[in-house]
């Protein structure tokens, strides 16, 4: 059943940068808060959803099957199934793709799909050696045995935890940190430190411009209770309030002083001797959540919904994990071929900015005759992507990359860009730890 699937609404939280301590919201808090606001403005009850699907890479230990947790907390009721997907950085795009598959197989007409992560709450873990010590201590039967174990205990063992997020950002096959895979691409395509820093400064500048123009908030810029109904649909971000009543209204990782010159002062992080990838030209560790509401034509007619975009096609691809950041090229290209499109036949692009080097490598790969022939099976290069159409409101280098949410965010932002500019078609694409990539072609119908 190849029926059309439409995005009829969507929203996200502000993306909140990790400040080296647990943030104010868990992943389910983020998903629930923005989901409640999104559902409250719909002409149907949350219990009329057919399904809720949430992507999450790092739920808390008390958020098992976080998709179900969020569905219940959003008021969807016991009868609406809620479940969780995990495809690392593309978890939020996988949730959309999974929803589409279910809708096209006749298993739903109205599905809420999204993603969320609170990376600031990634755990600190005991080492295997320390866990073994606890096991031995629990098995010790006499005071003497326990005392002997205490004498063997090194303060360094106790006070040097395993940093969970560093383990999560390390590929288990290649043994490389994600930033080291970006260094591989920079070396392969001859991408300089200056190019990376210039790209990163542009990301910050574009987010600042979008914030100054109220683009992310639309009619919600003043947080007025009068800015409701149709006007409110122009808002991408919905504000958050924590338990103390503190308002979180904007993405807070962007820096107005992020110029190429300032970024050039930062030291390489992943290859300290020879590298060029720094904290400044990499995505930030961030907390955030996002949803899109998907509907078939039947659901649109039944509830009087307004379709905003049609999801035309999607594609997943894989490469050597050590070349992780290049896979968007391999996910996007088959979509373009299937629809007879060139790079610049699209009106807008989103390529998630895991690393500046990684996005720039994708652009260089399409330009390379050798790469297009040997790796993509093409007769010539794809040409130069118009960077004025790419990440026009900035990207993860300035906004942050809450892993489970980013795939949904780039689809949502792409929709808003097409609406705002009157563009017809756009692609959202994302690289994925483990040597994967995903892409989604959407068409503006509003």
PLM ranges: what are they?
Residues 1-26, 37, 153-168, 260-326, ...:
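Condensing-enzyme catalytic core mediating Claisen C-C bond formation in acyl metabolism
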Residues 12-13, 24-28, 33, 41, ...:
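N-terminal extracellular/periplasmic Venus flytrap/periplasmic-binding protein-like
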Residues 24-143, 221-223, 227-230, 235-250, ...:
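Conserved beta-ketoacyl condensing-enzyme motif
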Residues 27-43, 66-70, 95-98, 178-185, ...:
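Short, well-ordered amphipathic alpha-helical segments that serve as non-catalytic structural scaffolds
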Residues 56-111, 121, 157-159, 173-177, ...:
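Conserved catalytic cysteine-centered active-site region
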Residues 86-117, 125, 186-215, 227-230, ...:
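Active-site-proximal alpha-helical scaffold in enzymes
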Residues 110-184:
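Flexible glycine-/small-residue-enriched beta->alpha junction loops
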Residues 183, 233, 243, 312-315, ...:
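Active-site pocket-lining segment
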């Amino acid at each position: 059943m190849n029926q059309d699937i439409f995005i009829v609404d969507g929203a996200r939280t502000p993306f909140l940068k990790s400040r080296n301590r647990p943030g104010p919201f868990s992943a389910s808090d983020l998903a629930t808060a923005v989901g409640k606001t999104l559902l409250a403005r719909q002409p149907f009850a949350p219990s009329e959803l057919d399904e809720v699907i949430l992507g999450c890479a790092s739920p808390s230990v008390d958020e098992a099957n976080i998709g179900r947790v969020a569905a219940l907390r959003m008021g969807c009721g016991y009868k609406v199934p809620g479940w969780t997907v995990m495809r690392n950085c593309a978890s939020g795009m996988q949730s959309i793709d999974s929803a589409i598959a279910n809708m096209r197989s006749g298993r739903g007409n109205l599905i809420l799909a999204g993603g969320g992560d609170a990376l600031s709450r990634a755990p600190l873990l005991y080492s295997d050696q320390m866990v073994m010590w606890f096991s031995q201590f629990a098995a010790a039967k006499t005071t003497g045995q326990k005392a002997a174990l205490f004498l063997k205990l090194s303060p360094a063992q106790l006070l040097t935890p395993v940093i969970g997020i560093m383990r999560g950002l390390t590929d288990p096959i290649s043994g490389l940190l994600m930033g080291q895979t970006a260094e591989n691409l920079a070396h392969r395509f001859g991408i300089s430190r200056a190019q990376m820093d210039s790209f990163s400064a542009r990301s910050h500048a574009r987010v600042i411009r979008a914030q100054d123009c109220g683009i992310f908030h639309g009619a919600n810029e003043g947080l007025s209770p009068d800015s409701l109904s149709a006007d409110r649909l122009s808002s991408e971000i919905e504000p958050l309030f924590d338990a103390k009543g503190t308002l979180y209204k904007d993405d807070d990782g962007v820096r107005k002083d992020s110029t190429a010159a300032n970024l050039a002062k930062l030291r390489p992080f992943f290859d300290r001797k020879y590298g060029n990838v720094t904290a400044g030209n990499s995505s930030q560790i961030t907390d955030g959540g996002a949803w899109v509401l998907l509907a078939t034509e039947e659901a649109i007619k039944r509830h009087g919904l307004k379709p905003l975009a049609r999801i035309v096609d999607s594609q997943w691809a894989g490469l050597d994990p050590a070349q992780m950041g290049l896979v968007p090229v391999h996910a996007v290209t088959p979509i373009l071929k299937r629809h007879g499109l060139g790079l610049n036949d699209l009106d807008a692009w989103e390529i998630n900015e895991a690393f500046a080097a990684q996005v720039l490598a994708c652009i260089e790969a399409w330009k390379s005759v050798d790469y297009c022939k040997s790796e993509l099976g093409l007769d010539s290069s794809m040409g130069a992507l118009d960077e004025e159409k790419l990440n026009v409101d900035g990207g993860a280098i300035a906004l942050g990359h809450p892993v489970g949410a980013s795939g949904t965010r780039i689809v949502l932002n792409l929709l808003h860009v097409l609406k705002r500019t009157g563009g017809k078609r756009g692609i959202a694409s994302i690289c994925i730890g483990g040597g994967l990539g995903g892409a989604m072609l959407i068409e503006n119908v509003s």
